[in-house]
A protein has these predicted regions:
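A short alpha-helical cap/connector motif
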Residues: 1-67, 71-146, 150-225
Length: 225
């Protein structure tokens, strides 16, 4: 709740935000995910913030870094060139994640953030498969990971089924097999669906002069060993 004023300054999609500004109701990053991403960066003060899949999240991250006076480096891994994102990132890797040299992710340190928002599909040599089998097990203790479009502990909702997303099943297997290493922090969808938990952050929505999406799909976890 301490960053409510910062959230109030975010424009709605009807207010003609600049190309580099985050905005509510953007169709890709729901309100709760924007709030939690900003808060995570402000609280953790990471040296590096790495995105596998960039866009609205990059704009939120840049806003948090700028307003909180941080020196966090933004590293964007995304195959789609976009001038507005390139202007916000310190390091730009414009190739599919599975074809990129991602060895540097092993050097991420405590409180660094790895924000994953990729194809969400576990297929042979897909970016999601490569992330879970070649990256996640090699991350150092203390690294914070966000995986987007995850609905755990629930299954994918009906309205998502025609997208054929499957990565949350891989995530669930990691959590069930080694909960001591992969510690859940904030499951946004569960938070938004639980009446008691959702009431805790209701003052944020009441302070924003727009109708904002209160749900989210970010699943935050921390590497504990």
């Amino acid at each position: 709740l301490k960053y409510t004023q910062n959230f109030q300054s975010i424009k709605n999609n009807t207010e003609k935000p600049s190309a580099q500004e985050p905005f509510w109701n953007n169709l890709f990053l729901p309100g709760l995910d924007m709030v939690m991403l900003y808060t995570a960066i402000a609280e953790l003060k990471p040296k590096r913030y790495v995105e596998i899949g960039s866009g609205n999240s990059t704009k939120v991250a840049h806003k948090a870094i700028t307003e909180q006076g941080l020196k966090t480096e933004i590293i964007s891994i995304d195959p789609m060139p976009r001038a507005e994102i390139d202007a916000l990132a310190n390091t730009i890797i414009r190739s599919p994640f599975e074809d990129s040299n991602f060895d540097f992710l092993e050097d991420l340190e405590e409180n660094d953030i790895l924000f994953v928002d990729n194809s969400h599909r576990v297929f042979p040599n897909s970016d999601a498969t490569v992330f879970f089998l070649e990256v996640l097990p090699r991350l150092k203790k203390g690294v914070v990971v966000q995986i987007h479009d995850v609905y755990l502990p629930f299954d994918y909702p009906q309205f998502m089924c025609d997208r054929f997303y499957s990565e949350q099943y891989m995530l669930a297997a990691f959590l069930l097999a080694n909960s001591e290493k992969y510690a859940p922090m904030i499951p946004n969808y569960y938070l938004s669906e639980n009446k008691e938990l959702s009431q805790i952050i209701e003052p944020i929505w009441n302070a924003i002069p727009h109708a904002v999406e209160k749900h989210g799909g970010s699943f935050w976890l921390k590497i504990e060993k």
